[in-house]
Amino acid sequence: MNNIYKKSTLQAWNLSAQAAAVNDVLKFNNSQKTGCAVEFANGTGSVTIRKPGLYQIAFNGIAVESGTAGDVAVQLQKNGADVPGAIAQATSANATAVVNPAFETIIEVPQSCACVNNTAVLTVKNIGVAANFANANLSVVKLC
């Protein structure tokens, strides 16, 4: 079968609960991908994009804070820097309050050359209170 028109995609998820302290990167234990623009290793939290283009990034999950009431928040980072607008925040009133953080954004990965490597490494970072995340899901789709 000719896959010339097949999009590069990644669907990464973690169904089981994972404890995430403040500033921890969320990890995804399972994945399914197509194409060759996106690289990911199960059990990690880093997605590497090696081909230039526009990419749609979406995250969702279920979270419960783990002891201290406050804001449960996650932030998409590209090469260690926050991606503006790619943040989800919800207030958890107590240790049993369930929140559903989610965000969606589009990023651009510029063309690389011999002297400039524009590879993008994406992570989802817990920037709120320590929390337990379950059913975390990250999708990356190369639009063009």
Predicted regions and their residues:
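Extracellular jelly-roll beta-sandwich "head" domains, especially the C-terminal globular C1q domain
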Residues: 1-144
